[in-house]
């Protein structure tokens, strides 16, 4: 960062809090109904209820909303929150959304912020208004109209989506695991395919119970291992006309020269050996050029017959990033931000989590889109928001990489924990790695509920889990 950029950054972070957002021009017919907050309170609007957005809303509500220092509004299109690293378990059926989801409306009421259902479709920076699109129910009936929300400080935390790179057929015939709804939809299709194969008169045909997972990052690799376990559990439940060794096939396809390209080589090699030992077909250096209704076409001409295809490759920001009134975006469609987490074009707008693009000073690569980065940015911005309200210069965010952990279902957990010395890491696996992996979710829960409630939830979970099915059938 040059001297001029640093000077601008410090001026922006010391800038006084902006005046209340502009009201509609008298006589003008607005395109949206406009929600105007209490003018006596600074209004913080958070778009997106993922890990970063919900943790920030909860912390701000507990510290500032409780004392009526600010007004906080969280906007999210979903009704409930599921920790995104758990979506592969939802897809496999080993995690029950109905039991583990957090209801936004109830959580907001308990933690002194407001929840508004909606999805951002645009932004007017001059009036400081976020435009929300209409929402509909499953029958196509309108739930909420198009409207706008005025803000004094805007935090964009809309996460990321998988990137199909324009591959023909990917959107039509592959399922992504970006949301809980998508994960539930995949699980329902999986169970239905098993029931159909069990009930049919003839034998299982080629490709009928084949699942191809495109992208062998953490999500794809974890899903492959989890599916191996749950598909055999479905057979054990009574769908015994299916032979899990002969009829079931899981193929994991990765364009890079190995799976888990973001983790150390030895961790990836260990995961590959385990997956192949389970009978999972691991294909590295394999590029998908087309997804069809009945399978996947590779660049080398091979066709993989598949009844279900999951696309978990690539990461990019949501399409709406390109429609945010001139905010700077990266080639991966993420919002470019400064070390203070402010966007480069507007000091009143922040971005955190997967949708944010930040290259830390002294680094050459951006902060990776991981849950630990989202949580760290949420905690940092919570502290900085108090400084902002008091007109004090904002401090830069410093990312700490604690390593990567990959859960391979009940079989094992592997990973690399970063030490105090940069670049040095400790490879872990087995029970200790599993404990560390589960601790990541406990930390997310503690950010939302506090230590004592998490302890009570854990105790209740251990008492009820023995009476529940290992795999959901609905």
Positions of the model-derived regions?
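FAD-site-proximal beta/loop scaffold in flavoenzymes
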Residues: 22-32, 172-201, 294-297, 303-308, ...
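Conserved N-terminal Rossmann-fold NAD(P)-binding element of oxidoreductases
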Residues: 47-48, 156, 214
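Beta1-alpha1 glycine-rich phosphate/pyrophosphate-binding loop at the start
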Residues: 2, 10-122, 218-263, 310
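FAD-binding core/adjacent interface of flavoenzyme oxidoreductases
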Residues: 2, 6-41, 113-210, 310
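A Rossmann-like FAD-binding core segment of flavoenzymes
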Residues: 69-71, 111, 115-134, 228-339, ...
């Amino acid at each position: 960062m040059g001297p001029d950029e640093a000077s601008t950054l410090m001026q922006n972070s010391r800038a006084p809090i902006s005046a209340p957002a502009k009201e509609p021009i008298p006589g003008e017919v607005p395109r949206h109904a406009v929600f105007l907050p209490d003018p006596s309170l600074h209004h913080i609007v958070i778009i997106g209820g993922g890990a970063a957005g919900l943790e920030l809303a909860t912390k701000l509500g507990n510290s500032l909303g409780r004392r009526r220092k600010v007004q906080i509004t969280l906007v999210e299109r979903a009704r409930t929150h599921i920790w995104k690293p758990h979506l592969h378990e939802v897809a496999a059926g080993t995690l029950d959304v109905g039991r583990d989801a957090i209801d936004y409306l109830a959580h907001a009421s308990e933690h002194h912020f407001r929840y508004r259902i909606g999805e951002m479709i645009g932004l007017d920076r001059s009036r400081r208004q976020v435009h929300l699109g209409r929402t509909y129910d499953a029958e196509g009936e309108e739930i909420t109209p198009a409207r706008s929300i005025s803000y004094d400080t805007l935090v964009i935390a809309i996460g990321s989506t998988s990137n199909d790179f324009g591959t023909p057929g990917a959107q039509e015939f592959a399922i992504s695991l970006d949301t809980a709804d998508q994960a539930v939809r995949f699980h329902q299709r999986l169970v239905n395919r098993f029931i159909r194969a069990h009930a049919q008169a003839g034998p299982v045909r080629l490709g009928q119970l084949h699942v191809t997972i495109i992208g062998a990052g953490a999500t794809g690799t974890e899903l492959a291992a989890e599916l191996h376990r749950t598909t055999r559990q479905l057979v054990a439940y009574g769908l015994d006309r299916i032979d899990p060794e002969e009829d079931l096939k899981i193929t994991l396809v990765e364009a890079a020269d190995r799976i888990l390209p973001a983790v150390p080589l030895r961790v990836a090699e260990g995961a590959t050996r385990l997956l192949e030992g389970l009978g999972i077909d691991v294909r590295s250096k394999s590029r998908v050029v087309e997804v069809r209704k009945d399978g996947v076409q590779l660049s080398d001409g091979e066709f993989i017959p598949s009844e279900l295809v999951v696309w978990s490759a690539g990461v990019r920001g949501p399409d709406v990033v390109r429609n945010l009134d001139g905010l700077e975006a990266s080639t991966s469609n993420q919002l470019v931000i400064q070390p203070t987490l402010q966007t480069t074009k507007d000091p009143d707008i922040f971005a955190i989590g997967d949708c944010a693009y930040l290259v830390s000073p002294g680094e050459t690569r951006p902060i990776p889109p991981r849950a630990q980065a989202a949580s760290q940015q949420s905690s940092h911005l919570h502290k900085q928001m108090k400084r902002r309200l008091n007109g004090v210069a904002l401090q830069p965010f410093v990312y700490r990489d604690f390593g990567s952990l990959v859960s391979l279902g009940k079989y094992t957990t592997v990973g690399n924990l970063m030490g105090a010395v940069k670049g040095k890491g400790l490879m872990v696996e087995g029970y200790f790695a599993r404990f560390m992996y589960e601790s990541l979710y406990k930390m997310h829960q503690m950010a939302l509920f506090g230590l004592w409630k998490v302890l009570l939830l854990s105790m209740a979970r251990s008492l009820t889990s023995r009476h529940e099915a290992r795999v959901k059938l609905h």
